[in-house]
Regions:
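Interhelical loop/hinge segments that connect adjacent transmembrane helices in multipass membrane
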Residues: 36-52, 230-238, 253-286, 353-356, ...
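Helix-loop junctions and terminal segments of transmembrane helices
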Residues: 109-124, 328-353, 359-362, 366
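Short runs within selected transmembrane alpha-helices of multi-pass transporters and secretion channels
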Residues: 70, 78, 109-116, 176-195, ...
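Transmembrane helical elements of multi-pass membrane transporters/channels
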Residues: 59-74, 240-252, 256, 268-344
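Alpha-helical transmembrane segments of multi-pass membrane transport and lipid-handling proteins
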Residues: 136-163, 220, 359-410, 442-443
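N-terminal membrane topogenesis motif
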Residues: 2, 6-73, 129, 133, ...
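Signature of the first transmembrane helix
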Residues: 38-39, 55-116, 141-143, 150, ...
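Transmembrane alpha-helical segments of multi-pass transport proteins
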Residues: 233, 284-285, 488-546, 556
Length: 556
């Protein structure tokens, strides 16, 4: 029985998602208020861990729960959109987003991370009074760049569509997206502030409201616009995005006012400090996004050289980039939650010159990431065919998921490495790595796609992730001396994942196109249980052997 995704199902999922995350948010807010009341009376809550560690894991768990909820709803939402407007419609909206993505980068590049880093450093050094000046400078910086980006995108939409995208149907969507850039840049400022003060619950509720609103509005718009053609469908997707950003800005600004009420600090705007950090990040992002835009523009063109028609090229590109890649990135939501919190943690330790603390945190982060990434890669590869059929009803999507599964460990590790480098102030180095990465990507896309088709793009993704991670890791190892237990973090997880995958394929009968969501869920749960049991068993044996060896060595 095929899995049919209806508009009512999507809207109901978004409502459940909103309720679930609001509950987590309110629970965390209650806990924080209770802690503040107790501390005011001269008491302390002690749970056997430092306050920073507890806050880090509280925030990480909150963001993980939020991220999984959002990504799950988003996955089914994207599947609904794909089935409603078709692969060609997804392809058109994807190429529209290449130009829009560059505009977003120009409007917001580096500002969220800049605010996070400056606010975290100021708090770590006891300079709370400088936070208002940092925020004022960041707001001015964001307004200048976002206003310019919005005007250029709106008035240049026709030229971008005709000359750059080679599809005049994209012009209307670009004009609709232009007004979203100003609120989006201001959201980045306030989001960075809340991460910097380690109150990510504020960001969580904003994201929940925004995505719930976007899903409900876009489902309604696309459901009515789909019969009108590909162009109208892309326009409705764009309209949903613009209105959502405006709603999100209103919500997060209201939360900011509540957070800062009664706060005092120096007047004026410290735009110089903001620009010093944001400029290198911005330049890196501008150049990389420009190169990324070029890359995504030439992909459909090189596919036509391979022999595909315009519609076939957009469909193939939409399947790989709009279906397979989101599935590959789905498990990374957990890592993204914690890796985003690593930036202020490393920034504070860097300011305090706590090298031992940075080393311990890096070792924990990389060891955990490796175990999780190896498991994710194995599950994506083993269930690639079923995921393609169940979520997207597409055999090609399953093929691309299997092809990209091999790069998952490198991709996830690179994500964590990048966050650590930004936390210790290595954003300029990351800038040059990202620029060379993008240049090589364009070269490989130009070279491989006419020979291999869309699989050439998959090969390009794998090669460039490996390149980026290698250079980033070399730099990080020069700054922080840390070690990773390869047996416990790579060999044992890989062996356990292979065992779980082998047993699942042996014990469960593959239904191919007829696989149901419930059957797939049971397979994945079974595989996770086998992995957990086998990995835990291997680790117990390994730890026991190490203890015996140490005792034996000590006896001599």
């Amino acid at each position: 029985m095929l899995f049919k995704i209806s508009p009512c199902f999507i809207i109901a999922s978004s409502v459940l998602h909103f309720t679930f995350t609001a509950f987590i948010y309110l629970t965390k807010e209650y806990r924080e208020r209770l802690s503040e009341m107790i501390e005011e009376r001269g008491q302390k809550i002690s749970l056997g861990a430092s306050e920073n560690t507890k806050r880090f894991f509280y925030n990480g768990i909150l963001l993980t729960a939020l991220g999984i909820s959002m990504r799950t709803v988003s996955l089914f939402f994207n599947a609904f959109i794909t089935r409603t407007i078709g692969a060609e419609g997804v392809g058109l909206y994807t190429v529209v987003n290449t130009v829009y993505g560059f505009s977003v980068t120009f409007a917001t590049a580096g500002i969220s991370l800049t605010v996070t880093r400056l606010v975290a450093s100021a708090r770590g050094e006891g300079r709370e009074e400088s936070v208002p000046r940092i925020l004022s400078g960041a707001i001015l910086y964001a307004l200048c760049f976002s206003t310019v980006a919005a005007l250029v995108l709106y008035f240049g939409a026709g030229s971008f569509a005709a000359a750059v995208l080679d599809d005049i149907r994209a012009a209307s969507s670009l004009r609709i997206l232009a007004p979203s850039l100003v609120p989006l840049s201001l959201i980045s400022v306030f989001s960075g502030y809340f991460i910097g003060i380690k109150k990510v619950a504020r960001n969580a509720i904003t994201q929940v409201i925004g995505q719930s609103f976007k899903i409900c509005a876009t489902v309604w718009l696309c459901h009515n616009a789909a019969p009108l053609g590909v162009e109208k469908s892309a326009m409705m997707l764009s309209l949903g995005t613009t209105v959502t950003e405006i709603v999100c800005f209103i919500v997060i600004f209201f939360e900011f006012l509540l957070e800062r009420r009664g706060a005092r600090g120096g007047r004026g705007a410290d735009i110089v400090s903001v620009a010093k950090v944001a400029a290198p990040l911005g330049i890196s992002a501008y150049i990389r996004q420009a190169l990324l835009t070029i890359e995504h523009i030439i992909i459909p063109k090189r596919l036509r050289v391979y022999g595909s028609s315009h519609g076939e090229a957009l469909s193939a590109y939409g399947t790989l980039h709009g279906m397979a890649l989101p599935m590959i990135l789905y498990p990374m939501v957990t890592l993204s939650s914690f890796s985003g919190l690593l930036v202020p943690e490393f920034a504070e330790r860097e300011s305090a010159d706590d090298k031992a603390g940075m080393r311990r945190l890096a070792e924990r982060a990389f060891a955990t990431t490796l175990v999780y990434a190896v498991l994710s890669a194995a599950l994506l590869f083993v269930f690639s065919e079923e995921l393609g059929y169940v979520v997207y009803k597409s055999r090609d999507a399953g093929t691309y998921i299997a092809a990209l599964a091999s790069v998952v460990p490198i991709m996830y590790l690179d994500h964590v490495t990048d966050s650590v480098l930004k936390g210790i102030g290595e954003q300029v180095y990351s800038m040059w790595v990202n620029i060379t990465d993008s240049l090589l990507s364009i070269f490989l896309v130009w070279l491989l796609i006419p020979k291999m088709g869309i699989m050439g793009y998959a090969v390009c993704i794998i090669a460039m992730e490996a390149y980026n991670f290698t250079l980033s890791l070399i730099r990080l190892c020069k700054r922080i001396r840390f070690r990773i237990p390869m047996l416990a973090s790579v060999v044992f997880p890989a062996a356990s994942a292979l065992v779980s995958g082998f047993l699942v394929k042996r014990l469960f009968i593959s239904a191919g196109r007829e696989t149901s969501p419930l059957w797939l869920a049971l397979e994945i749960i079974f595989a996770l249980c086998v992995f957990a049991g086998s990995y835990r068993g291997v680790m117990l044996i390994y730890d026991g052997a190490r203890i015996k060896i140490k005792k034996h060595s000590a006896s001599y």
